UniProtKB/Swiss-Prot annotation:
One annotated Gene Ontology cellular component of this protein: cytoplasm
Name of the protein in question: Heat shock protein 83
Protein localization: Cytoplasm
Originating organism: Bombyx mori
InterPro entries in UniProt: HATPase_C_sf (IPR036890), Heat_shock_protein_90_CS (IPR019805), HSP90_C (IPR037196), Hsp90_fam (IPR001404), Hsp90_N (IPR020575), Ribosomal_Su5_D2-typ_SF (IPR020568)
HAMAP family per UniProt: HSP90 (MF_00505)
Protein function: Molecular chaperone that promotes the maturation, structural maintenance and proper regulation of specific target proteins involved for instance in cell cycle control and signal transduction. Undergoes a functional cycle that is linked to its ATPase activity. This cycle probably induces conformational changes in the client proteins, thereby causing their activation. Interacts dynamically with various co-chaperones that modulate its substrate recognition, ATPase cycle and chaperone function. Required for piRNA biogenesis by facilitating loading of piRNAs into PIWI proteins.
Similarity remark: Belongs to the heat shock protein 90 family.
GO molecular function: ATP binding; ATP hydrolysis activity; ATP-dependent protein folding chaperone; unfolded protein binding
Entry superkingdom: Eukaryota
Assembly: Homodimer.
């Protein structure tokens, strides 16, 4: 334990790590990871965030910087003591911050990161889950954090990761403001204290950090000694040597005087060397920047361990001037749609000065996966969040960013392989955009990809669907459901597919919201095959047959409606079924079965809407099916026949299930099925099966078992 802790034991407080954090630290310490170097990237990134915070606060209150004007990050390796120190002059942490942020309150990403690690994910993902600090234990067996916040005294946090940590007042060297992290580096990892290694890591991961990163380096220089110092040194040397008398000594001395030179010695000294002198990449000309430079900047900006998928670098000039650099990541973060998550990942700068990184009005929520920077020449430096909401300049910037993002997606769509990767990760965002962004709905609809009854394993665009439409086809047919197999085998698509029309398969819950907003595409109406009023092109003969069927089955429809009463709004003859006897369709503007399922699954649903949105069900019967034809004959013979009533209810409930609805009383339906099974097995409903209770613990043989056994012997 450090000396301060021994001299002031009363002031030392010990805390236990929250269980998930202790688990995570154990995982980090006890598992071998080859890329341990990412610890430095994470600590520098945290320092940069702390500097961002104090700079932002100082824009509205310059006195916040009285405790230290210069904003920088400093790295000090000390091989003699076996430590690596990272200092920043950021906002610092109060005692409560140290206790909460470094141990007792788990971040939302702690558990998710551990699960990802155990599933084989890369340790370098750690920063994306908000737990980057703990990567210190990849290289250190003890970590000490000194921190000073403007609103509190200076404190020290320390832990050797044994399940607990201590916090105490810091009586050591005052920091002014900021944080000093001292890593007590493991003996076998001394390379991380080497100057060349630190430079290599910073260049690789952090060269685009917006604050100076200084490394304390040890150098040598030659120092000239003055005549007096040289004489003194020479005298000391001569005093040590035995003196030998020489006859020609005086003559030699005269010669030496003429050749006397100033003596120099080598001395060691330390100085700070700035490691990231590169000017902000977004201010440079896009033609001069290589893909590798974009990749390095993206990784330093996002802490992502993978390369970006696409990049858009542009500037807008004229009445309004700003530059932007936008990236599409290769994969979606684990918490993309969490409410507590920041609404966007764009850093806002004003004339190269960082302002904020969670400006909600900068980009719409559906584009919250886009990473990058925007640097405005026109916004005031001391702008607050409240002022930004009203700012007209910001609205113009937002409009341009959306436009450029859509351009970027269109460019990406030209490369099928890359677009497939992008779509797998971010299709929900595009669909959310169709629901929320009416201005860009048409452009976003071009970016959608769906599997269809004719597309095989490849998803296709709506444009491709339209190009394959039959001559007499006026509508785009679609079906919503839980998965491809379910919708492909649905009774609703039977007739449509048989006629040779293509059906779009929409299998994500968000698709239900998409079709509510996107009523048409390229002048073609989107028509659900699960809703009433499905009209398929017909010739005169088909029309005539349909009219005849309506008349023929009118009586059965009335009987079925009377039996089902208010369970259905009406019973009609279907034009969409081929192999199934019946199906349940919904009203044109009501919920589909899939939407009803989604709404029932909402934890905070509004039950008042369930009634009027979900009630309008229509039962459609297939006039060409033998079950329906036989049922018609039975109903016409005796419409009060109990068997007809039972069969109609059973048909209705089965149709509910096959059409994607849930049953309100599944047990009653099960009882009906069991009754049908009994009938099939010839069991009389009225004869109860006698089961005698066994007298002892032994189970007696069932009635007839002995006979069965003897019969089995005969067979043998």
């Amino acid at each position: 334990m450090p000396e301060e802790m021994e001299t002031q034991p009363a002031e030392v407080e010990t805390f236990a790590f929250q269980a998930e954090i202790a688990q995570l630290m154990s995982l980090i310490i006890n598992t071998f990871y080859s890329n341990k170097e990412i610890f430095l990237r994470e600590l520098i990134s945290n320092s940069s965030d702390a500097l961002d915070k104090i700079r932002y606060e100082s824009l509205t209150d310059p006195s916040k910087l009285d405790s230290g004007k210069e904003l920088y990050i400093k790295i000090i390796p000390n091989k003699n003591e076996g430590t690596l120190t990272i200092i920043d002059t950021g906002i610092g942490m109060t005692k409560a911050d140290l206790v909460n942020n470094l141990g007792t309150i788990a971040k939302s990403g702690t558990k998710a990161f551990m699960e990802a690690l155990q599933a084989g994910a890369d340790i370098s993902m750690i920063g994306q889950f908000g737990v980057g600090f703990y990567s210190s234990y990849l290289v250190a067996d003890r970590v000490t954090v000194h921190s000073k916040h403007n609103d509190d005294e200076q404190y020290v946090w320390e832990s050797s990761a044994g399940g607990s940590f201590t916090v105490r007042p810091d009586s050591g060297e005052p920091l002014g403001r900021g944080t000093k992290i001292v890593l007590h580096v493991k003996e076998d990892l001394a390379e991380f204290m080497e100057e060349h290694k630190i430079k290599e890591i910073v260049k690789k991961h952090s060269q685009f950090i917006g604050y100076p990163i200084k490394l304390m380096v040890e150098k040598e220089r030659e120092k000239e000694l003055s005549d007096d110092e040289a004489e003194e040194e020479k005298k000391e040397e001569e005093d040590e040597k035995p003196k030998i008398e020489d006859v020609g000594e005086d003559e030699d001395e005269d010669k030496k005087d003429t050749k006397k030179k100033k003596k120099t010695i080598k001395e060691k000294y330390t100085e700070d060397e700035e490691l990231n002198k590169t000017k902000p990449i977004w201010t440079r000309n896009a033609d001069d920047i290589t893909q590798d430079e974009y990749g390095d900047f993206y990784k330093s900006l996002t802490n992502d361990w993978e390369d970006h998928l696409a990049v858009k670098h542009f500037s807008v000039e004229g009445q309004l001037e700003f530059r932007a650099l936008l990236f599409v990541p290769r994969r979606a973060p684990f918490d993309l749609f969490e409410n507590k998550k920041r609404k966007n990942n764009i850093k806002l700068y004003v004339r190269r000065v960082f302002i904020m990184d969670n400006c909600e009005d900068l980009i719409p929520e559906y584009l919250n996966f886009i990473r990058g920077v925007v640097d405005s020449e026109d916004l005031p430096l001391n702008i607050s969040r409240e002022m930004l909401q009203q700012n007209k300049i910001l609205k113009v910037i937002r409009k341009n960013l959306v436009k450029k993002c859509l351009e970027l997606f269109e460019e990406l769509a030209e490369d099928k392989e890359n677009y497939k990767k992008y779509y797998e990760q971010f299709s929900k965002n595009l669909k959310l955009g169709i629901h929320e962004d009416s201005q860009n709905r048409a452009k976003l609809s071009e970016l959608l990809r769906y599997h269809t009854s004719a597309s095989g394993d490849e998803a296709c665009s709506l444009k491709e669907y339209v190009s394959r439409m039959k001559e007499n086809q006026k509508h785009i047919y679609y079906i919503t459901g839980e998965n491809r197999d379910q919708v492909a085998n649905s009774s609703f698509v039977e007739r449509v597919k048989k006629r040779g029309y293509e059906v779009v398969y929409m299998t994500e819950p968000i698709d239900e919201y998409v079709v509510q907003q996107m009523r048409e595409y390229d002048g073609k109406t989107l028509v659900s095959v699960t809703k009433e009023g499905l009209e398929l092109p017909e010739d005169e003969e088909e029309k005539k047959k349909r009219e005849e069927d309506k008349v023929k089955f009118e009586g059965l429809c009335k009987v079925m409606k009377n039996i089902l009463d208010n369970k259905v709004e009406k019973v009609v003859v279907s034009n969409r079924l081929v192999e199934s006897p019946c199906c349940i369709v919904t009203a044109q503007y009501g919920w589909s079965a899939n939407m009803e399922r989604i709404m029932k699954a909402q934890a905070l649903r509004d039950t008042s809407t369930m009634g009027y949105m979900a009630a309008k069900k229509h039962l459609e019967i297939n006039p060409d099916h033998s079950i329906v034809e036989t049922l018609r004959q039975k109903a016409e013979a005796d419409k009060n026949d109990k068997a007809v009533k039972d069969l109609v209810i059973l048909l209705y409930e089965t149709a509910l299930l096959s059409s994607g609805f849930t049953l309100d009383e599944p047990q009653v339906h099960a009882s009906r099925i069991y009754r049908m099974i009994k009938l099939g097995l010839g069991i009389d409903e009225d004869e109860p099966i006698q089961v005698e209770e066994p007298a002892s613990g032994d189970v007696p043989p069932l009635e007839g078992d002995a006979d069965d056994a003897s019969r089995m012997e005969e067979v043998d």
